[in-house]
């Protein structure tokens, strides 16, 4: 796993929704090797423990990396206070990303809440072959829909309260699309119960599926056991590091 650590200039910052921020980081040496599904480990000012944040976009031409995150604790709140022109301490790119297969003709991307940003690089790669299903609590939490449409993807929006889009779980339109039998692959990121159900649906439909796990992390490089999780391969249980072996896993694992 090749990665680098340094302080990089913030090229842009904006609020996308309540407590959700987007930051563009100038880091050409990282964008050259980063791939969809990987993450960055950011050190908030005044803290000693880094925070893992998924990569939302990789612009090799401009040499900028985009992250989108929600402010849940003190660490992410400090990151959100950083402004354009300031430096951000980052270890990146980390983890095992998504499998890209250009033979796929129809791709379904499923994002739940803050699990939606990692889907954007895939939408940009697969373009018009992509249908993006996004799920949020309410209309005020919706993000990145214009970005997905700009990438050429078809979008299906779901909310828990029905304040915009469909009032349903993301698994409902997913099952409908698979019933039509026109999907070659599913990529998903979001809460564990959502990923578990998507994995079951994919296996029952015989469709290739990869999921990106959201997990607490310590070192980010596989040296500690904070993010260890059970996986299954060839009928046997194994332990894997989400930060190193993941965060992307085949759904059958």
Where are the language model's segments positioned?
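Structural signal for conserved beta-strand scaffold positions within catalytic alpha/beta enzyme cores
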Residues: 12, 57, 157-159, 211, ...
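Short, basic/aromatic-enriched C-terminal tail that caps enzymatic domains
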Residues: 1-4, 239-253
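FNR/FR-type flavoprotein reductase catalytic core
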Residues: 76-214
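Ferredoxin-reductase
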Residues: 2-84
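Local cysteine-cluster metal-coordination motifs and their immediate loop/turn environment
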Residues: 118, 192, 215-247
């Amino acid at each position: 796993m090749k990665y680098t650590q340094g302080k990089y200039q913030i090229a842009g910052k904006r609020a996308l929704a309540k407590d959700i921020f987007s930051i563009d980081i100038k880091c050409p040496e990282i964008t050259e090797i980063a791939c969809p599904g990987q993450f960055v480990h950011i050190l908030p000012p005044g803290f000693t423990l880094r925070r893992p944040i998924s990569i939302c976009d990789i612009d090799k031409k401009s040499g900028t990396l985009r992250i989108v995150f929600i402010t849940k604790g003190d660490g992410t709140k400090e990151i959100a206070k950083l402004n354009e022109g300031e430096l951000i301490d980052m270890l990146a790119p980390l983890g095992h990303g998504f499998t890209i297969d250009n033979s796929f003709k129809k791709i379904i991307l499923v994002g739940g809440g803050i699990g939606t940003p990692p889907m954007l690089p895939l939408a940009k790669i697969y373009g018009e072959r992509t249908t993006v299903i996004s799920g949020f609590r309410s209309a005020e939490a919706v993000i990145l829909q214009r970005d997905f449409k700009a990438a050429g993807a078809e979008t299906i929006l779901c909310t828990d309260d029905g304040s915009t889009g469909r009032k349903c779980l993301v698994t409902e339109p997913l099952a409908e699309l698979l019933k039509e039998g026109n999907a070659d692959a599913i990529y998903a990121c979001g809460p564990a119960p959502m990923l578990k159900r998507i994995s079951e649906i994919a296996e029952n439909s015989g469709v290739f599926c990869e999921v990106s796990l959201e997990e607490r992390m310590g070192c980010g490089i596989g040296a500690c056991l904070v993010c260890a999780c059970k996986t299954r391969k060839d009928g046997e249980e194994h332990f894997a590091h989400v930060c190193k072996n993941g965060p992307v896993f085949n759904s059958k694992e």
